[in-house]
From Swiss-Prot:
Gene3D superfamilies named in the record: 1.10.150.530, Aldolase class I
Assigned keywords, A-Z: 4Fe-4S, Cytoplasm, Disulfide bond, Iron, Iron-sulfur, Metal-binding, Methyltransferase, rRNA processing, S-adenosyl-L-methionine, Transferase, tRNA processing
Binding sites annotated in the UniProt record for S-adenosyl-L-methionine: G165, E166, S197, S219, L220, H221, N301
Protein known as: Dual-specificity RNA methyltransferase RlmN
Segments forming domain Radical SAM core: 97-339
An example Gene Ontology biological process: rRNA base methylation
Native source organism of the sequence: Paracidovorax citrulli (strain AAC00-1)
Single GO MF annotation: tRNA binding
PROSITE patterns: RADICAL_SAM
Binding site for [4Fe-4S] cluster: C111, C115, C118
Length: 373
């Protein structure tokens, strides 16, 4: 079986080339051709020795993910659905802005965490993506957008691991993919412009801080354990105190001096003044050292199976003001791509569920979710 070269970071590719009797500088050349120029045909790689190109043709390939569909929003957001085999498909979303281009990437086919407000969680979980399948989303999007815009300049300046899946539950594939994105011979992203979003897998947060510390976002969504247990089931394993301690440890190594807490605003569930006061006490405890953080309030994007509703704009604004008045930097996420189901929490793809999530979620829909003070 031939090797997919998208699976390798530069060190891995150098080791592979060494097995072929080649020096490291050949791996650098090959890496640049693949990631900077978007080449998948070894015959195009003109500065590689013909003998190496022939070797590669017999033992390696560059495997793009088949594109099932592409949708473009009225606001310019682009969503791609990629086929990852065995009846599974994952989604990636490009969000253009005046000063940046952000790509939201998936790390798993489905998700096993099962957050109540997330469409992906309702799809269940099939499998982890490989490093190559993670990188292939960036590889395709970057070079497809360059071709569309008629430019050789970099289009994607920021990558967020906020698509389908919990990245830190796919750690062994995640880290080589991050290293490829950061490598100056690859995509050359700054550690500050590469963000991993987690629902709070505490041991892997500690490992990432040592192995490949990039910007960190944490899906918080509740100010106390009782409510977070309902919204983010992983909280039952790693409760808030453990999670916040992990955030503090992570900041010792992080490229940014704050953690971004993501907070999906759910009408009547987690959006009341008391919840804001509890959040303030959580991250700014009286008499204790708090977590350096900012909050990103996310308007909920409804989907039929959730049984939940979006907080009204006035409630979101009042909630944000309470946090801001307490000295916490707070933003409200602008909804992008909701007309093509590309907004936060809407990515679902097509998942061959191996966790019976649909059955569990159907049972949960009969339970009235109530805020817990």
């Amino acid at each position: 079986m031939t090797k997919n070269l998208l699976d390798f970071d530069l060190d891995g590719l150098a080791a592979f080339c060494e097995q072929l009797g080649e020096k490291r500088f050949r791996a650098v050349q090959l890496f640049r051709w693949i990631h900077q120029r978007g080449a998948s045909d070894f015959a195009r790689m003109s500065d590689l020795a013909k003998s190496l190109r022939e070797k590669l043709s017999g033992c390696a390939h560059v495997a793009a993910l088949p594109v099932i569909s592409e949708h473009v929003s009225a606001d310019g957001t682009v969503k791609w659905l990629f086929d990852v085999g065995d009846g599974n498909a994952v989604e990636s979303v490009f969000i253009p802005e005046d000063d940046r281009g952000t790509l939201c990437i998936s790390s798993q086919a489905g998700c096993a965490v099962g957050c109540r407000f997330c469409s992906t969680g309702h799809q269940g979980f099939s499998r982890n993506l490989t490093s190559g399948e993670i990188v292939a989303q960036l590889w395709f999007a970057e070079h497809a957008l360059r071709a569309r815009l008629g430019t050789q300049e970099r289009v994607i300046s920021n990558v967020v691991m906020m698509g389908m899946g919990e990245p830190l539950q796919n750690y062994t594939a995640l880290v080589p993919a991050l290293r490829t994105m950061l490598d100056d011979h690859g995509y050359g992203l700054s550690r500050r412009r590469l963000t991993v979003s987690t629902s709070g897998v505490v041991p892997m947060m500690d490992r990432l801080s040592q192995d490949c510390a990039v910007a960190m976002a944490v899906s918080l969504h509740a100010p106390n354990d009782a409510l977070r247990d309902q919204l983010v089931p992983l909280n039952r394993k790693y409760p808030l105190r453990e999670l916040l301690d992990a955030c503090t440890r992570y900041l010792e190594h992080a490229p940014r001096d704050f953690i971004t807490f993501e907070y999906c605003m759910l009408d009547g569930v987690n959006d009341q003044p008391e919840h804001a006061r509890q959040l303030i006490d959580l991250v700014r405890p009286r008499g204790g050292e708090g977590v350096r953080c900012k909050f990103n309030l996310i308007p909920f994007n409804p989907f039929p199976a959730s049984g939940l509703h979006r907080s009204n704009p006035q409630q979101v604004a009042a909630f944000a003001k309470m946090l801001s008045d307490a000295g916490i930097v707070t933003t409200v996420r602008k909804t992008r791509g909701d007309d093509i189901d590309a907004a936060c929490g809407q990515l679902a793809g097509d998942v061959k569920d191996r966790t019976r999530a649909a059955e569990r979620m159907a049972r949960q829909r009969t339970i009235v979710l109530k805020p817990v003070a």
